Swiss-Prot record:
It comes from Vibrio vulnificus (strain YJ016). Could be a mediator in iron transactions between iron acquisition and iron-requiring processes, such as synthesis and/or repair of Fe-S clusters in biosynthetic enzymes. Pfam families: Iron_traffic (PF04362). HAMAP family: Fe_traffic_YggX. GO terms for molecular function: iron ion binding. Keywords: Iron. PANTHER family: FE(2+)-TRAFFICKING PROTEIN-RELATED. This is Probable Fe(2+)-trafficking protein.
Length: 90
C-alpha cells in the first residue's frame, strides 16, 4: 500500500515518494512533504534547467544553484524561470 503525504507543493493529500531520493535533512524534508506528482514536476524542470543553463553536476556551485531552485520550487511555490523558454501553446 502506498503512503500518502500532504504535499507542500500541491497543497493536497497525494501519494508520497517510495523512498528518500535526496540525501540529508533536505532529503528527509522532501520525503515527508512532497508527493510523487510534485517530484515528477520538479524532475522535468530540473532537466530543463540543466540543459538550458548547461549546468555541470560535477561543479559544486552548479549543484548549489540547482538545490536552491529545487527548494524554491517545491517548498516556496516559486516557478523555475528558464531564460528563452516559451511553453507550447495549448
Amino acid at each position: 500500500m502506498s503512503r500518502t503525504v500532504f504535499c507542500a507543493r500541491l497543497n493536497k493529500e497525494a501519494d508520497g515518494l517510495d523512498f528518500q531520493l535526496y540525501p540529508g535533512e533536505l532529503g528527509k524534508r522532501i520525503f515527508d512533504n512532497i508527493s510523487k506528482e510534485a517530484w515528477g514536476q520538479w524532475q522535468h524542470k530540473q532537466t530543463m534547467l540543466i540543459n538550458e543553463k548547461k549546468l555541470n553536476m560535477m561543479d559544486p556551485e552548479h549543484r548549489k544553484l540547482l538545490e536552491t531552485e529545487m527548494v524554491n520550487f517545491l517548498f516556496e511555490g516559486k516557478e523555475v524561470h528558464i531564460e528563452g523558454y516559451t511553453p507550447p501553446s495549448k
